[in-house]
Regions:
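Generic structural detector for well-ordered beta-strands
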Residues: 9-13, 53, 66, 99
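A conserved amphipathic terminal alpha-helix motif
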Residues: 111, 116-152
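Hydrophobic-ligand binding "helix-grip"
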Residues: 31, 58-109
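Beta-strand elements of well-folded, non-transmembrane domains
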Residues: 14, 56-58, 84, 116-120
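Hydrophobic ligand-binding cavity/cleft-lining segments
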Residues: 1-45
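Hydrophobic pocket/interface hotspot
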Residues: 18-23, 29, 50, 67, ...
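Residue-level marker for the onset of beta-strands and adjacent loop->beta junctions
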Residues: 6, 37, 48-50, 63-64, ...
Length: 152
């Protein structure tokens, strides 16, 4: 796997099964990920793909990702297969992961990690100056959205 670039975690006051249901439900992705407008595909079976219509601060496009690892109530790992927004050109071997840990009957730790290698020198500079920070902010928002849905 590529280098870890961003890591965030949260404690959610909900059973691990509820949190798992949220992160594997295709119908909730637009409520979880702030850039997703619409999504098709599957998020609950290893090897399946999802295609997301995205709006990244006014730049619209699509991203197709493959679920390359799925461990029930433990872990999901997504890899970008192709996109129209340029991420695949900027990042080598991007992976986006969720890891869950049961802390109690009604308490779950969720970790969101982004792995990738900058594709060239310019992207390496951008990564240090802004991309890693922005990735971390997006992860924080995603975890907050999951927490809000799970704790309702």
């Amino acid at each position: 796997m590529s280098k870890l670039q961003a890591h965030n975690e949260a404690i959610i006051n909900a059973p691990i099964s509820n949190v798992w249901a949220i992160i594997t439900d295709i119908n909730l992705l637009d409520k979880v990920n702030p850039g997703v407008i619409k999504v098709t595909g599957r998020m609950d079976k290893q090897g399946e793909t999802r295609t997301c219509e995205m709006d990244n601060r006014g730049k619209r496009g699509t991203m197709t990702e493959k679920l390359v690892e799925l461990v029930h109530e433990k872990k999901t790992v997504w890899a970008i297969e192709n996109d129209t927004m340029g991420m695949a050109k900027m990042l080598k071997d991007p992976r986006f992961c969720f890891c869950l840990e049961k802390l109690g009957d009604n308490k779950t730790k969720i970790i969101n990690e982004s792995y990738y290698e900058p594709a060239n020198l310019m992207v390496r500079i951008m990564n240090v100056l802004m991309m890693k920070k922005k990735m971390g902010e997006i992860q924080g928002q995603i975890l907050s959205n999951i927490k809000n849905i799970a704790e309702k």
